[in-house]
Amino acid sequence: MVLRTMLVKPHCLEKMIRVIRNLCPDIMVLTEVEGKHNSPSFVNRFIEVLFYYSAYFDSLDAFMEAADPNRLAMEGTLMASAVRNMIAREGGERIMRHVGLDTWRLFLNRVGFEEVEVSEDALYQAKLIVKSYNHAESVSLEMNGKSLTIGWKGTPLHSVSAWRCF
């Protein structure tokens, strides 16, 4: 599920998370964009989106050829629509809204989930995988509290967090 698309309808998001909460899964893993692209201020949102996607495109340059069909599809479909959504749309028309891990922490704690620490083993395995690629020095894998933040050249791009019912 993509929670960032539900932020525009907070009552639906809360209802869905409460349904998951009532199922009381042993663990729920949340992987989300680590961006603050939900500002009502166009200028603030534009700057955040610019820095985030500059880092994202830079990482694609490092790992994929410019003519790679997968890269072209990702840039032309996924990323273009996300940027267009966050920059060119306002209010209810702006469907995709990225918020940072701290916002998800507050929300999930409020609806009955507690954060579970990503294990040292998982972090170690992630670092081993990253080291197997060129440009590994540009990838950051850092703990943010109990969660993992994945970044490129100092810019956080994604977070991975684990949650359980309390």
Predicted regions and their residues:
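Domain-level detector for long C-terminal conserved domains
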Residues: 1-166
